[in-house]
Amino acid sequence: MKILLADKQDITRAGLNYVISKMEGLETQTVEDKADLLLTLRENEDTVVILDYTLFDINDATELLILNQRFPYTRWLLFSEDLSTDFVKILIASSTQFSVLLKECSLMELKEAIRFCVASNRFVCQRMMEVL
């Protein structure tokens, strides 16, 4: 299965590429911006998008929800430094296709989140669960 990396930080992309390369049956592809993401999802929407929402060119929760409706087989792993509680609540309440992982989480939690998303299950990291 293909994992799309939608993160502007080179070091984060390099780390994710490395971690995912060690996981069987998965491959990564980097998307540079929203236009590139849309083109790639049109080719194959049955994928996982690891998205740093705070650094990518998606404006708000509404826009992300529209993308979720447009590509219903895509799983979204929001992987960011800081996400507002209200933002996360909106997404979690709207669709089971959204998962949440903070960049401060452990490597074990990162791998678990990716496995959950690949299996079409929702994942919310422990830290975010405590806040919600």
For the regions a language model picked out, list residue spans one by one.
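Short hydrophobic/Thr-rich beta-strand motif most characteristic of the beta2 strand and flanking loop
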Residues: 25-33
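Conserved active-site segment of CheY-like receiver
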Residues: 8, 79-83, 103-105
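Conserved phosphotransfer microenvironments
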Residues: 48-67, 80-87
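Conserved acidic segment of CheY-like receiver
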Residues: 1-11, 16
